[in-house]
């Protein structure tokens, strides 16, 4: 199985880059994994609701145009179902057992995902009801993917 993460925004903070690289390395024995970054759409300070929708639409088109028709897409959405780590592990492994050769997670920008992209997703999950920097979401998702493989393989996870 291959896992792909499509994300809006470039990681600027070194501590996040280091953490992301660490978990990419840890995941490699279990699965091929890649992160593809797309640039943030420009937005002025204190945008109006219509400007926010425009930003989400522009960012959404970048991700949407990258997807293929047969991609299995999971969007990360604050308002969708939350899974604990064991449930997340089962969720990912169920996709693998069903023969999914590629799972694509999508992470929106600061204002979230466009409606078009939400409709395109095959499923949507929430990592938490808490709000995180969207750049931090990548690290949290990678850690949970790694933890999920460790749970599935019944291996000790050295934190």
Where are these regions (language model features)?
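Structured adenosyl-cofactor binding patch, chiefly the S-adenosyl-L-methionine
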Residues: 115-159
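Short, well-ordered alpha-helix to beta-strand connector turns
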Residues: 31, 70-71, 121-122
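S-adenosyl-L-methionine/SAH cofactor-binding core of RNA-modifying enzymes
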Residues: 39-101
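A mid-sequence interfacial segment
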Residues: 86-128
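General small-molecule cofactor/ligand-binding pocket signal
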Residues: 6, 34-36
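N-terminal beta1-alpha1 ligand-phosphate binding loop
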Residues: 1-27
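Residue-level preference for the first positions of well-ordered beta-strands
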Residues: 2, 72, 102-106
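Short glycine-rich anion-binding loops that position phosphate/pyrophosphate groups of nucleotides
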Residues: 11, 78-81, 109-111
């Amino acid at each position: 199985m291959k896992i792909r993460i499509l994300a809006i925004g470039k990681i600027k903070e070194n501590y996040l880059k280091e953490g992301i690289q660490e978990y990419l390395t840890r995941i490699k024995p279990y699965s091929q994994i890649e992160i593809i970054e797309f640039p943030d759409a420009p937005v002025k300070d204190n945008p109006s609701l219509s400007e926010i929708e425009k930003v989400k639409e522009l960012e959404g088109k970048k991700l949407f145009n990258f997807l293929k028709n047969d991609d299995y897409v999971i969007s990360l959405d604050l308002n969708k179902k939350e899974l604990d780590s064991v449930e997340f592990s089962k969720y990912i492994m169920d996709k693998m057992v069903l023969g999914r050769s590629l799972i694509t997670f999508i992470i929106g920008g600061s204002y979230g995902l466009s409606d078009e992209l939400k409709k395109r997703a095959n499923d949507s999950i929430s990592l938490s009801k808490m709000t995180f920097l969207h750049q931090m979401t990548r690290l949290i998702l990678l850690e949970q993917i790694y933890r999920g493989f460790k749970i599935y393989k019944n291996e000790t996870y050295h934190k």
